[in-house]
Every structure is written in C-alpha cells, then in structure tokens.
Regions:
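Pre-Walker A (Motif I) flank of P-loop NTPase domains
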Residues: 1-2
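Hydrophobic anchor at the beta1->P-loop junction of P-loop NTPases
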Residues: 5
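The conserved Walker
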Residues: 9
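Conserved lysine of the Walker
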Residues: 13
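Hydrophobic positions on the alpha1 helix immediately C-terminal to the Walker A/P-loop
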Residues: 16, 20
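Conserved substrate/cofactor phosphate-moiety recognition/catalytic segment
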Residues: 21-63
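A basic- and aromatic-enriched beta-loop-alpha substructure that forms the phosphate/nucleotide-
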Residues: 59-100
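A glycine- and Lys/Arg-enriched "phosphate-lid" helix/loop adjacent to the NTP-binding pocket
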Residues: 88, 92-167
Length: 177
C-alpha cells in the first residue's frame, strides 16, 4: 500500500511525516522524493524550464518504480507525490516558465497515475500555516496559492483523498481514523 501526503510548500508535509515515522515504525517512509533526486541548484525557481522539469520527471519515475516494489513488501508513506510535481509544473506553465506541451504531458502522466490508483490514500494538506523560508522553497504566497489550486483541481474527482487540517496532533488523529 502507498499512502502519500500532497500539498503546496509550507503545509507541514515533512513535519507530519516525521511524526508518522514515530507512530508507524514498521512502514517504509520516503522523505522528500524530489529533494532526493535533485540538487538545490536544480530546484531554484529562477532555473525552471522544460529541461529542468523533464530531468526531475525522469528521476521521479525511477524513484516511483523503486517505491512500487518496496510497497509490495512494506506499507509505504510518501511526503509528496506526482500530484505535487504536476501542480508545480502547471503553475510554472501559467507563469510562462514551462511550455504548454510539457505541462499537458505531465498532466496526462499524473491523471494516468491517479486513474491506475497508484496511491491507495492521498492525504491533502491545505494552506494553514505561514511560509517558512528555508533558503530553497519559494516564499511567494501567490505561487503557494496557485500550486494549491492546481492540486485541488488534480484531486477533484479522486475518491481516495482525505483532507487533513489543524495542528499536527489533529492531523495525526485524522490519519489514524
């Protein structure tokens, strides 16, 4: 089984995953899958292009194949999914950084994964907290809202999505129910 968190930046995904590790020691956890496969330089917002996103897409594909194999043995929890990557790609397309062709291709890839139920449960984390400046992620609230809107659009017809809200303890309680 694959459980995944999804949400724009600064919604508490990594913090929540850290707490889940304590509660579910027999699960496999995949932290920051996009961060594992790229350098800080590749994730800089001023370097976004079809090329950079395509490199990230290829790396994510490889990581997904690994996780699909692991999930056959151990329940797996991810702190981000292909939905997140696609939402950012669509947002960057709206900002003119990514071509329409590449954005459409990634939207197709995302919809294919959702249709095939690659994720057993998707936990959506809406914007509830201030953006934390970690020197990498954007502090642009408009981008945060745009990505959140794209995520909601991608998940619109997904019946396996659960929205989590509140502080960390409230979110943990919602997951365990």
């Amino acid at each position: 089984m694959i459980y995944t968190l999804t949400g724009t930046h600064s919604t508490g995904k990594s913090t929540l995953l850290g707490k889940l590790k304590e509660l579910y020691p027999n699960f496999h956890f995949n932290d920051s899958s996009t961060r594992e496969v790229t350098s800080k330089e590749e994730r800089r917002l001023d370097d976004i292009s079809d090329d950079s996103q395509n490199r990230l897409f290829k790396a994510i594909e490889i990581k997904e194949l690994e996780l699909l194999q692991v999930s056959k043995i151990l329940p797996t929890f991810m702190d981000r999914s292909f939905v997140d990557f696609t939402a950012y790609t669509l947002a960057f397309n709206k900002q003119g950084k990514i071509s329409d062709t590449f954005a459409a291709m990634m939207q197709y890839e995302c919809e294919k994964r959702l249709l095939l139920n690659q994720y057993d449960i998707i936990f959506y984390l809406p914007i509830e907290f201030d953006i934390v400046d970690d020197g990498i992620r954007s502090v642009d609230k408009e981008l945060q809202r745009l990505v959140d809107t794209e995520i909601k659009g991608l998940l619109l017809n997904q019946t396996n999505t659960i929205t989590l809200s509140g502080n960390i303890d409230e979110r943990l309680k919602q997951i365990s129910n």
